[in-house]
């Protein structure tokens, strides 16, 4: 599938097929945001959501490994950090965010998720965006972007997904 549109200085048609799937999802998210917020703000919205989606997937993978081990360490933060995985509290997990996608509180849910992650991961203190509850960001539109990242971006292979943040920023 080739697109003639230009986004991020690159023509979608010039991309390899391996990248088009992910970049099409970014394009779809940008199209949803188009007309609702300034184009310069897309990155802030999208990168924060991709970050949440990625760390939640990495956490879930590690959580399942710890449960399978059966030693009861699935709630021990050190069991995650020793594997270079951020601890993600319940209120910040993607499943919580996705379940709130079609509520008027979605922006607050995402901002609270960012705060919770910062509280449990001091290295991220004051780093994550917390602008999703802004009255300038239409919550219906934000919910649509969350849906795109829930339904169309596969994070099951977190090692392969590590590059998504860099690719998102470059795109």
Locate predicted features.
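Non-catalytic, mostly N-terminal accessory regions of nucleic-acid modification and defense proteins
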Residues: 2-171
């Amino acid at each position: 599938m080739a697109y003639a549109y230009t986004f991020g200085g690159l023509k979608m048609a010039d991309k390899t097929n391996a990248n088009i799937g992910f970049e099409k999802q970014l394009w779809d998210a940008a199209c949803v945001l188009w007309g609702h917020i300034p184009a310069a703000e897309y990155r802030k919205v999208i990168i924060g959501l991709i970050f949440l989606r990625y760390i939640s997937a990495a956490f879930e993978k590690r959580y399942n490994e710890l449960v399978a081990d059966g030693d009861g360490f699935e709630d021990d933060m050190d069991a995650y950090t020793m594997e270079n995985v951020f601890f993600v509290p319940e209120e910040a997990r993607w499943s919580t965010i996705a379940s709130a996608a079609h509520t008027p509180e979605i922006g607050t849910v995402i901002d609270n998720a960012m705060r919770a992650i910062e509280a449990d991961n001091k290295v991220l203190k004051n780093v994550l965006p917390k602008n999703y509850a802004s009255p300038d960001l239409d919550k219906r539109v934000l919910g649509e972007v969350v849906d795109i990242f829930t339904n169309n971006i596969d994070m099951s292979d977190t090692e392969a997904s590590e590059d998504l943040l860099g690719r998102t920023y470059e795109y």
